[in-house]
Regions:
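A Rossmann-like FAD-binding core segment of flavoenzymes
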Residues: 33-143
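Charge-dense, low-complexity intrinsically disordered segments
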Residues: 18, 57, 178, 182
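Amphipathic alpha-helical segments in well-structured domains
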Residues: 24-28, 67, 141, 184-185
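Rossmann-like NAD(P)H-binding beta-loop-alpha module
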Residues: 2-47
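Cofactor-binding loop segments of dinucleotide-utilizing enzymes, especially the Rossmann-like FAD-
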Residues: 15, 51-53, 161
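Short, flexible/disordered intra-domain loops and linkers
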Residues: 21-24, 56-62, 170-175
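Conserved active-site and cofactor/substrate-binding residues in soluble primary-metabolism enzymes
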Residues: 22, 26, 65, 82, ...
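FAD-site-proximal beta/loop scaffold in flavoenzymes
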Residues: 1-4, 113-184
Length: 185
């Protein structure tokens, strides 16, 4: 209610190494819809900041026509975006972003103002599991073989979000792959 009474800029997005981009897109669209219903969207500039190389990459190299579909929705709803973005610092009301080109070289520095922000973090595994030597990758996720068994300890199996899934492709700013492929089902 406080924001509605005194609206301002919104920044939504995903930090480098994030691997679950859907909730950030969903948040942007839900906020856009809600602010329009309240008739204050015209007073709320929105910027989507992401490590993805393009809108709709989703950590998967795109899904069908996700790039043009999401870009079109963002344009139609006046949501600006910054891709290939490395969040370098956050201060009260400001997100500092380095945007890189396709080779990873600095292209542009941004200071993005906000009154409300939601950035998806890069996930990490839990310390007790991550601390086991040779069990996990540097982010703390269990490295497994095709049978979902630890590559180092053949009596340890892993399923779900604790599994280390390699990126689908190399991107200028690190993006992870969503972990939906290794659920227990």
């Amino acid at each position: 209610q406080k924001f509605v009474d005194d609206p301002g800029a919104i920044v939504i997005g995903a930090a480098p190494m994030a691997s679950c981009f859907g909730p950030a897109y969903e948040t942007a669209m839900i906020l856009d819809t809600d602010l329009r219903k309240r008739k204050i969207r015209d007073r709320v500039p929105m910027t989507y900041v992401t490590s993805e190389p393009y809108i709709g990459h989703l950590g998967l190299g795109g899904v069908g026509d996700s790039k043009s579909m999401l870009e079109s929705e963002f344009r139609n709803n006046d949501i600006k975006w910054i891709t290939n973005a490395k969040t370098t610092k956050v201060e009260a009301g400001k997100l500092f972003v380095t945007q890189v080109d396709d080779l990873g070289n600095t292209y542009k520095e941004h200071e993005v103002p906000f009154k409300l922000s939601m950035m998806l973090p890069a996930f990490k595994g839990i310390e007790p599991v991550a601390a086991v030597p040779e069990l996990c990758n540097p982010r703390g996720f269990v490295m497994i073989d095709e049978f979902q068994r630890s590559k180092k300890f053949k009596n340890i199996f892993a399923a779900g979000v604790c599994v280390a899934i390699p990126p689908v492709e190399v991107t200028p700013v690190a993006t992870g792959a969503p972990k939906t492929g290794y659920m227990i089902e």
